[in-house]
Amino acid sequence: MATDLTQEFCALRDTYIEKQFGRLNDMKRQAVFTTDGPLLILAGAGSGKTTVLVNRIANLIRFGSAHGSKQTPRPATEDDIKALRNAIMTGTAAPSWLDGMLRQNTVRSWNVMAITFTNKAAGELKERLRRMLGGEEGDEVFASTFHSACVRILRRWAEEIGYPRSFTIYDTDDSQRVMKAVYKDLNVDDKFLPIKAAISQMSRWKDQLVSPEQALASPAKDTKGALTARIYAAYEKRLKEAGAFDFDDLIYQTVQLLAEHKDVRDFYQNKYRYLLVDEYQDTSVAQFRLVSLLTGPEKNICVVGDDDQSIYRFRGATIENILNFERIYPGTKTIRLEQNYRSTSNILNAANCVIQHNTERKGKTLWTSNGEGDKVQVYTAENEQDEASHIADVIGQHLKEGGHLADHAILYRMNAQSAPIESYFTRAGIPHKIVGGQRFNDRKEVKDIHSYMSIVANPRDDVRLRRIINEPARKIGATTVEVITDLAAQEGVSMLDIIGHADQYAKLSRAVMPLLKFWQIYQRLQDSLETRTLDEFAADVIELTGYKAMLEADAAKGHEDAADRLQNLGQLVNNVKNYCDQHGEEATLEGYLEDIALISDIDSYNESADQVVLMTIHSAKGLEFPYVFLIGMEEGVFPSEMSKYSEADLEEERRLAYVGITRAKKELYISNSVSRMLYGRTQRNEPSRFLREIEPEYIEETRSPVLEQRSRFGGWGDSYRDTVPGGASGYSGPSGWGRSASGYGSGGYGSGYSNRNGYLNREYNAGEGRGFGSAYANRGQSQSGYGSGYGRSGAGTGYGSGYSSAYSDRTTQKKSAKQISFTGAPAAKTAAKGAKHYEPGDLVEHKVFGRGQVVAVKPAAGDQIVEINFEKVGIKKTMANFAPLTKITAEE
């Protein structure tokens, strides 16, 4: 009887536990209830992997391995069954006296480590755990980034590898300062071996766990390779003397620590019995090794990732880590999460079409119950200005329909592509934010104050000391700094030790007074740290160093940026206070400096600001937006030119396209341009192969009105279809649009498969079109060029003809450009005849901001700066000739 009751109770317990995770789909519940041994969760884009991580941790802590178990700590009773059945039926919590019967092999919250790639993701994970488990248990789970986890380990054990526990973390600027000193010591010419190239190679070595000794011992391919190894050794020696790690060292040195010290390794394997790693597809060799060293003998490791979103190969990530996980950890259970909760079917189908062309992947197909949604909008622009104008038009329409600026993201392959968009938006007065621009903590005044704070935390930090010893100016010149550096090296002490005893060194006799004054400032800062709160200490640094007085004097002299720099320092103090509020009694100077060193671009992205966001696709990883514009979908741009020569690189580019597509929730806009200027050179590009890989049924294509107008003269070939039984259909592509360069135009090209308008070159590999054409041009004048195109696929054939213009020199091209007007994108200089003119009181309508009234007008370089009070967004300033403005009457 007791056995029967226990079996009944176990069945009810399974039902009760399942109800606690009732919002999860079947595959997610499988992942949550798989508690022991290695687990690989292949989580597709938008599948809710954070939800799985949070719920899996919650299950480990609350129920352990109880689900699916046939065991109980004691025989079940009728009362147990009655109470549990009632809880299930009423949807209430089971009585506390049943807790012991509902648990089995539960895990203490402090025995769980969850590693993510961004502070933002770690923060979201912890916040959701607090809500699910309660504040105390949620806080005890260690959720952190790789680098933050390593900092925590090193703060405790750094002395085991010869570093102080108060070590400093160097950023890129600090590393370059160290390298300049190394180059001087080794007499290396930066022109022969650029510092950035040496730093990149050292970073690769650290990612691959190659020590300076191993680099020196390895046969070098050339002189530069051997020299870089010597630089690496000298660089690491200087960092150790300064008690500092660079960003790559945080993982590299932690791996060395764990590998070489079994007691440290055992401590963490026993402490963190369950390890969960997010974004595993983006781990490097060093991160893979770190994870394996932290994983205990029970192999309770769960990794979550998507091989189709592995896009950081250039940073050392290796997709093989996730592809080979099952081989490395025998007995792995693999679960695929393919249901997407973010996007519409058309968007997901487009993404699936693209990624299925990759071969190095586990394989999965995203699907959704969100509905079909709008088709993917593909726009072919004449050039990048036309592309920007089109995007502004679409955003304006969305705003009229009640949308918000922050709903829109413009994503691109490379940073250089943002300039035309930014320029157009600035002139049109469209609020926007570039993620990945200069960060707050990278501003000079902020870095200077942080350097002062750093030398108080770590007196051995000579690099930061050199930065600010004469900032503000104190009559401590470069020669004096070199003397101090040499003395410190001779005596094996820090530069601050020399400065504190400057009066004892004859070589410093001329600079004794400035140096001792600096020493007094340093001592006062130390006193401030010991006696005042951390934010008060930050304010003291700004005041006592003379930095505030320097900027106030600059402001009085009329320096334009002085007021902004003062405001930035005020914000710095606010940031320190916010850090103190978040960490309470655990707030320390070292902790604050760690936080700012580990902040990424995405961590500083403010989602609440109502502005269009511009960022690279790499930066957009993990984000989502209702409306996404994926620009520059052209051969040589996306995919990049260099990727064409490597199948591995091309597959990474395709994964990047997949990531970009899957950022969109409601609508996706993809654009390609016939002509694009990048890095000062204008080139004509074919549409990207990734566009051609999307099936026509999922997209809707339009093109620039200028291109439409040209097509009337044969600029774009008409589609022609000849279907042959047993063979593929043949279509003509954008045949005949000529390429103009050096006074001639070349013919167009055909394609194996075009859309209904005949201008996307599809089936790039299967049926590549061959174009033939000619153009005639005399230098100094523009002439017409006639091109014809031919394409075939299988047994089908397609033909088309086109007309193109070739402009033989820059003068003619510029003249012609004035004759072409783009909707919403005027030429750089508008002729007086067509210039817009506004007066205070004029009623206007803006494509983005809606209706408003002109309140002020100011002439500016043949244009007008117009100040407008808009009904919806208030006062905005914009350039008259660039803004998408239309005069209206009161009746309108």
Regions found by a protein language model. Give the residues of each.
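P-loop NTPase Walker
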Residues: 1-164, 169, 266, 320, ...
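Conserved helicase/translocase P-loop NTPase motor core
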Residues: 23, 80, 88-97, 146-150, ...
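Short basic/glycine-enriched coil/helix segment immediately N-terminal to the Walker B
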Residues: 33, 37, 104-109, 256-275, ...
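ATP-hydrolysis module of ASCE/P-loop NTPase motor domains
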Residues: 35, 117, 137-141, 158-249, ...
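Conserved helicase motor core of SF1/SF2 NTP-dependent helicases
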Residues: 47, 281-360, 364-369, 486-489, ...
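Helicase P-loop NTPase motor core
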Residues: 47-53, 68, 73, 77, ...
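Conserved helicase C-terminal RecA-like lobe
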Residues: 217-221, 404, 418-430, 443, ...
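C-terminal accessory regions
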Residues: 633-874, 882-892
